Design a protein with these regions (language model features):
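Gly/Ala-rich beta-loop-alpha elbow adjacent to hydrolase catalytic centers
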Residues: 140-149
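Short beta-strand/loop motif that positions the catalytic acidic residue
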Residues: 219-221, 226-228, 232
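Catalytic histidine-centered segment of alpha/beta-hydrolase-like enzymes
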Residues: 259-269
Length: 286
């Protein structure tokens, strides 16, 4: 039995007599987020072009990145166990079109050390980036970064257009993958939920609804383009279908095949759709 399986077995056993302790131990493992992903070799040239600065947010010195001359900023929000350089192929396209991409390494990711942050930390970071760079011509979010992007726009961040790639719709998805990896049983998952509620949200049990991208998504007033692969093994395609239904007529969903969770970032057709939409073209119907 490997370490992950042993850890899950131990947490499941502990959750019966001591759910609070099991939940707290699981939370501490969850918040680590895994090892920092290095910049991929094929992305190093784009990464090296960025102006790198830091933002002091909570306990973190957050690494931020900006490309271009500052005109027409486009915010890029990466996903779980990722980093800003994930967007390198899109950054190249946007620079060629005269846009100025802006991004950051989330807490516990990339060059930003420490533990992982929450949706509230992401909102603060995005707000500071808007203060520095101005209204965004577009916001592009991938995976968990898509959920963070929707929440930020609901909370008053200004942007003209929104692109959501392999999007997380339900906030509970932030722990679902972790729980599945450790094979946590329902009692241990419930203990983890409670520990997260207490540690980050003052015991508020409504966060799983309030911070879901589907919550009040109908209040979004900007055009939205969603792209999601039907074979995504990490975030089911159904998550984007749910988000599409919640947003309503301002949104369109493009379903790809064979790209899985990360292939959209380098797929030429997907990049064409994204950049055309950012430039003001109507969202494609399929």
């Amino acid at each position: 039995m490997n370490t992950i399986a042993l850890t899950g077995t131990a947490l499941n056993a502990l959750a019966l007599p001591a759910p609070a302790l099991a939940g707290e131990l699981a939370r501490r493992l969850w918040v680590r987020g895994g090892p920092a992903r290095p910049v991929a070799d094929q992305d190093r040239d784009v990464h090296a072009l960025a102006r790198v600065e830091t933002l002091h947010v909570g306990e973190w010195e957050v690494a931020t990145y900006a490309w271009g001359d500052g005109a027409r900023p486009v915010l890029l929000a990466h996903g779980w166990r990722s980093r800003a350089s994930w967007f390198a192929p899109l950054v190249r396209r946007l620079l060629d079109l005269g846009y100025s991409p802006v991004s950051w390494d989330a807490p516990g990711h990339g060059a930003t050390g420490g533990r992982s942050g929450t949706v509230l930390d992401a909102l603060e970071i995005i707000g500071l980036l808007q203060s520095r760079h101005g209204r965004f011509n577009a916001v592009v979010g991938h995976s968990l970064g898509a959920l963070f992007s929707v929440h930020a726009l609901r909370e008053g961040i200004d942007a003209d257009r929104l692109v959501l790639l392999s999007s997380v719709a339900d906030f509970e998805t932030v722990i679902a993958g972790f729980a599945a990896e450790l094979r946590l049983r329902p009692r241990a998952v419930a203990a983890l939920r409670t520990a997260i509620e207490r540690r980050y949200f003052g015991g508020d049990t409504t966060v799983w609804t309030r911070f879901s991208a589907t919550h009040d998504a109908h209040t979004l007033t900007l055009p939205v383009l969603l792209l999601h692969d039907r074979e995504d093994p990490m975030i089911p395609h159904a998550q984007s279908r749910r988000l599409l239904a919640a947003i309503g007529e301002r949104a369109r969903l493009v379903t790809t095949s064979g790209l899985r969770h990360n292939g959209i970032r380098t797929d030429a057709d997907s990049l064409d759709r994204i950049t055309a939409f950012v430039q003001g073209a109507p969202a494609p119907l399929s």
